[in-house]
Amino acid sequence: MSSRRDAREQVMKTLYANEQTDGDAEQALHALVRVPLDEDPSTRDFAEHLFRETLKTMEEADEIIEKHADNWEIHRIAAIDRSLLRMATTELLKFEEVPPKVSVDEAIEIAKRYSTPRSGTFVNGVIDAILLDLHDQGRLNKTGRGLIGMDTIQERAGSS
């Protein structure tokens, strides 16, 4: 498991806990991100940044998710799936250095591990539709390593 995977799993847990308890985001961040990832500062920093950006972007992400989750209102999506979709959408929108394929694949794999048997397929369908739509809108602003795989997305977007 990559250290970024560890970070994403902890962020998903933190988003979930924060939403379920309507609690203090800083307390959740400390307990579920800072303490478990304390020995790896770069992973911890990535996780903290992802958590904070996801909270900042949540309203926008929810609108995007609802648009692509056919017949699903955001509050009806399983809480873990909702957290993962918010996190992955935030990565697509705000993390220029993260390749879109990585954001998508990580969300799917974490969904398979932590959520329902069908969650991997559901998350895949929704986040893939989001990815193509963001590309078509010119909202995937990737640089450096984030450009890896963009040619494949452009090909897929052109054929849809």
From Swiss-Prot:
Gene3D superfamilies: NusB-like (1.10.940.10). It comes from the Bacteria. Pfam families: NusB. Keywords: RNA-binding, Transcription, Transcription antitermination, Transcription regulation. GO terms for biological process: DNA-templated transcription termination; transcription antitermination. Belongs to the NusB family. NCBIfam families: nusB. This is Transcription antitermination protein NusB. It comes from Salinibacter ruber (strain DSM 13855 / M31).
